[in-house]
Amino acid sequence: MIKFQVVNLNYKKVRFIKYYFTPLVILTWLASSTSFAQAATPTKSTPVKSITDVITNVQRDWLSDDGQFLLTLYSGVWNPHGTLFYLKQRGGVSVEGFQKGLDVTLKSYDPEVGLEAPPEYTIAGKINLRNNTMVGRVTHYPENKAKISIRKTNFTPAIPIKGAYPQFVFEYYGYDNPTGYSSIITRVDVINKDTKAVVQSLTGFKANSYSTNYADMNYDGYLDLMLDIGEELHDDNYAYWLYEPKTKRFVRDKTLGAIKGYPSRYPHKRQLHLNKDALLERVNGQWKKMPCCYAD
């Protein structure tokens, strides 16, 4: 048997999950995985069905009340993960952990060493979805163990908004892809979480269904929906539906959608890094191309 390494393309993060395939299964998988969203073209008779196994990754951006950190976290999944950025010096640390209900536990780690190494920081807290906050405690483990510190910390929105946060859930519809393992999303219904009413339907695309990202892509404090519309395995093309608070609707953004590359977010600098030639900074509601190649 052969150990197979699976890459989660949505996060741009390698997940070392051990799958055991026969050589025949591997060859079949490779052949079927070379094409994604455009591999299966629906006909008039292709039924559109509900796709229930889509993972919606909610990425939240929080400032600590002591002004030390910005925590950007993929939540709403069993293994929340993200980055704890330092605000009073350059850099930050990766964090990963577990989520049960609204309770989150995280620990920092060095990606080059792995999760087995002792953490520098641990975070435990409870998320409040209504006001987009997390109350918890941060424990620091310096090299000098005598100086371990524990501090109660309130994490509040990095970019606050006026009024209440929209409470949405998403329902996905599309069709089976006979040449791949994921279905194809052709419609997203935006549901008011409180009233259960459909407030908008997003159409006009073919997206891969393994996961979607719900994050503040244009740094206005509101979460936006990002869909993977890549046709090939390494085709980093995405559709961005940005939330407009004035109209209370999602609008597809052509500027970001025209740039190839997975967006790494740096909320404390209002920057998006999409590829080696595209580092953008949000200035006065507009994107400005930065001359350098890396954010931090």
Regions picked out by a protein language model, each given a short descriptive name:
Residues M1-I17:
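N-terminal secretory signal peptides that target proteins for export/translocation
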Residues T22-S32:
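Bacterial N-terminal signal peptides
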Residues P42-T153, I191-D194, V198-F205:
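Central antiparallel beta-sheet cores of small beta-barrel/beta-sandwich binding domains
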Residues T139-N177:
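Surface-exposed beta-loop interaction hotspot
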Residues Y141-E143, E231-H234:
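Short glycine/acidic-enriched loop and turn motifs that connect beta-strands
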Residues V169, N218-I229:
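Acidic/hydrophobic-patterned starts of short beta strands in beta-sheet-rich repeat architectures
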Residues L202-S211, I259-R265:
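Repeat-based blade/solenoid architectures
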Residues L227-I229, A239-Y240, R249-D296:
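Short aromatic loop motif centered on NTY/YTY
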